[in-house]
Amino acid sequence: MSKKPPNRPGITFEIGARLEALDYLQKWYPSRIEKIDYEEGKMLVHFERWSHRYDEWIYWDSNRLRPLERPALRKEGLKDEEDFFDFKAGEEVLARWTDCRYYPAKIEAINKEGTFTVQFYDGVIRCLKRMHIKAMPEDAKGQVKAQHPLSWCCPSDPAGSCNQSMGSEDWIALVKAAAAAAAKNKTGNKPRTSANSNKDKEKDERKWFKVPSKKEETSTSITTPEVEKKEDLPTSSETFVGLHVENVPKMVFPQPESTLTNKRKNNQGNSFQAKRARLNKITGLLASKAVGVDGAEKKEDYNETAPMLEQVLHSL
């Protein structure tokens, strides 16, 4: 085999170069060249975002290698991959903050993993990716010195010798005003209550207001008339103080049912005894009349039979 790599457009046969490789599952992945064996004409390819145990030796003229496709340009203004490390340390840029807005910043250092250590204009230091950094316009680079921290420049004059005036269109002032307005809105707004806290409040209110059961309703319905009766009756003699006894109307108190039933029974018994006495009188008169009638009949029979017996005796 040739000791020189072939000329394949879009692929640079160098250690660290990026390309796409086909794995054993017939899927393409972005990869990176780890080692090159010029004697055998093959390369050790590492699949990005995968463990090194999946690294594989592939011949440099294999169909399993192809140029890395360019990713779609993002709205942030990403350029070609060749401009990955286009920024330099100490350069003024626009860096993205957590609110997805870009603010003036300064690159402090460039890290090996492709990230940038950035210091914002208010002194906050963060580590950002390349996709979260934009180039600052040339006409705005001079205006940053009017609002930058003292550590950016003027180390010999800590009191602040940078007295550049701000224009009416200074976007840094606009950024600060927007940040102040956002802070005021945050402090002015009331804190939102979650749905769980509202549910807890409803539960507490339900605990205080219990719905009475059927048994409780019946018991209360029975007791309420008794209570009303008790309320109608006078509780003490204090209510009649200052009134004459003659003028006070007599109170008719309702009698209990037991006394009424006893009176009814007594009345029924008395009436029954009276009826019985009447019946006894009537039966006595009837019996006496019956006895008198029987005696008269016997006498008549005797008077009729006596002459007959005498005739029979005489005939004998």
Curated annotation (Swiss-Prot):
<dbReference type="InterPro" id="IPR047405">
    <property type="entry name" value="Tudor_PHF20L1"/>
</dbReference>
<protein>
    <recommendedName>
        <fullName>PHD finger protein 20-like protein 1</fullName>
    </recommendedName>
</protein>
<dbReference type="InterPro" id="IPR004092">
    <property type="entry name" value="Mbt"/>
</dbReference>
<feature type="region of interest" description="Disordered">
    <location>
        <begin position="183"/>
        <end position="237"/>
    </location>
</feature>
<dbReference type="InterPro" id="IPR040477">
    <property type="entry name" value="KDM4-like_Tudor"/>
</dbReference>
<dbReference type="InterPro" id="IPR014002">
    <property type="entry name" value="Agenet_dom_plant"/>
</dbReference>
<keyword id="KW-1017">Isopeptide bond</keyword>
<feature type="compositionally biased region" description="Polar residues">
    <location>
        <begin position="186"/>
        <end position="197"/>
    </location>
</feature>
<feature type="cross-link" description="Glycyl lysine isopeptide (Lys-Gly) (interchain with G-Cter in SUMO2)">
    <location>
        <position position="79"/>
    </location>
</feature>
<feature type="domain" description="Tudor 1">
    <location>
        <begin position="11"/>
        <end position="71"/>
    </location>
</feature>
<keyword id="KW-0677">Repeat</keyword>
<comment type="function">
    <text>Is a negative regulator of proteasomal degradation of a set of methylated proteins, including DNMT1 and SOX2. Involved in the maintainance of embryonic stem cells pluripotency, through the regulation of SOX2 levels.</text>
</comment>
<dbReference type="GO" id="GO:0006355">
    <property type="term" value="P:regulation of DNA-templated transcription"/>
</dbReference>
<keyword id="KW-0832">Ubl conjugation</keyword>
<dbReference type="InterPro" id="IPR043449">
    <property type="entry name" value="PHF20-like"/>
</dbReference>
<feature type="domain" description="Tudor 2">
    <location>
        <begin position="85"/>
        <end position="141"/>
    </location>
</feature>
<comment type="subunit">
    <text>Interacts with methylated DNMT1 (DNMT1K142me1). Interacts with SOX2.</text>
</comment>
<dbReference type="GO" id="GO:0005634">
    <property type="term" value="C:nucleus"/>
</dbReference>
<dbReference type="Pfam" id="PF18104">
    <property type="entry name" value="Tudor_2"/>
</dbReference>
<feature type="compositionally biased region" description="Basic and acidic residues">
    <location>
        <begin position="198"/>
        <end position="218"/>
    </location>
</feature>
<feature type="cross-link" description="Glycyl lysine isopeptide (Lys-Gly) (interchain with G-Cter in SUMO2)">
    <location>
        <position position="75"/>
    </location>
</feature>
<keyword id="KW-0539">Nucleus</keyword>
<dbReference type="Pfam" id="PF02820">
    <property type="entry name" value="MBT"/>
</dbReference>
<dbReference type="InterPro" id="IPR002999">
    <property type="entry name" value="Tudor"/>
</dbReference>
